[in-house]
Curated annotation (Swiss-Prot):
Keyword Iron: no
Subcellular location(s) per record: Membrane
Name of the protein: Delta(12) fatty acid desaturase fat-2
Principal localisation: membrane
PANTHER family linked to this entry: OMEGA-6 FATTY ACID DESATURASE, CHLOROPLASTIC (PTHR32100)
A GO CC annotation given for this chain: membrane
Family as reported in the entry's similarity comment: Belongs to the fatty acid desaturase type 1 family.
Task performed by this protein: Can function as a Delta(12)/Delta(15) bifunctional desaturase and behaves as a nu +3' desaturase. Introduces a double bond in the fatty acid chain three carbons away from an existing double bond to biosynthesize polyunsaturated fatty acids (PUFAs) endogenously (PUFAs are essential for membrane structure and many cellular and physiological processes).
Length: 376
């Protein structure tokens, strides 16, 4: 069956899925040790400092890496910068959610210190990302990676349909496509983009944008005003950081079996249960503050649990979801040492969502696989 095969989605013929009783957020929270909800500012700041030290170490090492290992070493350095840059982003990510500390001023300050150097406008990102957590797996309201329905897909141009299939697209999706150009949620740098509705939002956008511009200018000065050096040692590492971030966020919510819901079927807990913990291995999960393999816990309590408590909270959440383990709503975890190739594979095979039941969508390939299995 080809990528353009149309799946029959006549809504009148769709069954209604009977949803088992799902635990409340309060019930899940009660299963987690209380200290997991404690936000220690000093601990949080220590991770911010740690990531800066790692980045400084990589910059100190790059002349030697390039001298002894040439372009192959430089390519490896770019990947390392992408990983550590994403770790720094994750600290700012805690700041944006308020899980960094109980002090809003400290969260905002450290959030800008973490995000501005990697050209991620803190307050605009905070605004768009919040809606992703509030409406996870909602076909219309979820933000970040847009859900593509069969109708959306059929109305796209060839470039729009197959851009994601091109491997190099991953390096461009975060910066410049998402944050600067503003696809699909609106530019995070332009105060009058559709992302912002109030004067306060626009002022915050301008402040965060200026912070990014200052960091970029400082980098340009440190590069001795050389565009070539600036691109080679500052902007290209940021493209790798954007790639890693895109892969992290994509894999956390994508596989053939996950469900996406229309408004009448969506619920907060039901949506969060479609999140997937992915273990990358090789120490990468730890470097990136367990945002990869502790993401289910983060999604349930994104404003309450700091990243350094996610792994301890995860077994408790798994236990709370244990009665649902044989359903669509159980705890989900995969080991993905092949995370980069998994990402590339999904971009080819997961093209669009189609209805599997009334108000419930699934990727076309998953629906077809289920039908083929049922027909056997």
């Amino acid at each position: 069956m080809t990528i353009a095969t149309k799946v029959n989605t006549n809504k009148k013929d769709l069954d209604t899925i009977k949803v088992p009783e799902l635990p409340s957020v309060a019930a899940v929270k009660a299963a987690i040790p209380e200290h997991c909800f404690v936000k220690d500012p000093l601990t949080s700041i220590s991770y911010l400092i740690k990531d800066y030290v790692l980045l400084a170490g990589l910059y100190f090492a790059v002349p030697y890496i390039e001298h002894y290992l040439g372009w192959i070493g430089l390519l490896g350095w770019y990947w390392a910068m992408g990983i550590v840059g994403s770790a720094l982003f994750c600290v700012g990510h805690d700041c944006g959610h308020g899980s960094f500390s109980d002090y809003e001023w400290l969260n905002d300050l450290c959030g800008h210190l973490a995000h501005a150097p990697i050209l991620a406008p803190f307050w605009p990102w905070q605004k768009s990302h919040r809606q992703h957590h509030q409406y996870t797996s909602h076909v219309e309201k979820d933000k970040g990676h847009p859900w593509v329905t069969e109708e959306d897909y059929n109305n796209r141009t060839a470039i729009e349909k197959y851009f994601a299939v091109i491997p190099i697209s991953g390096w461009l999706r975060w910066n410049p496509i998402y944050t600067i150009v503003g696809l699909p949620d609106g530019s995070h740098f332009w105060p009058w983009s559709r992302l912002f509705e109030t004067t306060e939002d626009r002022v915050k956008c301008a402040v965060s944008g200026v912070a990014c511009a200052i960091c970029a200018y400082i980098a340009f000065v440190l590069c001795d005003y050389s565009v070539y050096t600036f691109v080679k040692y500052y902007y290209i590492p940021l493209l790798f950081q954007g790639l890693i971030l895109v892969i992290i966020t994509y894999l956390q919510h994508q596989n053939e079996d996950i469900e996406v819901y229309e408004a009448d079927e969506w619920g907060f807990v039901r949506g969060q249960t479609q999140t997937i913990d992915r273990h990358w291995g090789f120490g990468l999960d730890n470097i990136m503050h367990n945002i990869t393999n502790g993401h289910v816990a983060h999604h349930f309590f994104f404003t309450k649990i700091p990243h350094y408590h996610l792994l301890e909270a995860t077994p408790a959440i798994k236990k709370a979801l244990e009665p649902l383990k044989d359903t669509q709503y159980g705890y989900k975890r995969e080991v993905n040492y092949n995370w980069f190739f998994k990402y590339l594979h999904y971009n080819v095979t997961l093209d669009y969502l189609t209805h599997k039941a009334k108000g419930v969508l699934q990727y076309r390939s998953g629906v077809e696989a289920a039908k083929a299995k049922k027909a056997q």
